[in-house]
Amino acid sequence: MEALKFSNYYRKYGYSNSTYRHHEYSHDLNEAIIIIRKLIEDYKDIIKFYDLLLSLTNKEEDIKIIKDIMEDELKHNKVLKNLYYELTGNNLKEDRLNKFEDNMLNYKRNLEKGLKKELEETEKYRKIMSAMPDRRKTLSVMEILTDKLRHASWYNYLIAKCI
């Protein structure tokens, strides 16, 4: 009886047979494939960025956090390459030119840049996740998305330590 009341409440207010705000995040699979390809192509630049961060600190805790994030990025790259292959049947070549040219040697400013990048990527992963054709692929992307949110929290922590 309680479940029926709960169900009727949501039907009354227009939430039945659809996921809340689903239309905002429902995306085309082709768009998701383009985003995945771009994320894979940007991987080398991301690793260079983390190498720069490591070179700007000598704090043991900061180094451990940054290395943990780098390990997650390696895992994400493998998952994305696998997803790209499963969705397209093609492997991406990694012989592109790197565009990473950051001479900004300020640790805090680079942490802020990293935080902004992680938050921007959450939007991309949300788009990818909503376009996945099956639950296994959706869960793979969800794992990356939750890692991105965790990374953003770590960046906030490291930035706060710099103040």
Residue ranges and their predicted role:
Residues 1-163:
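Non-heme di-metal
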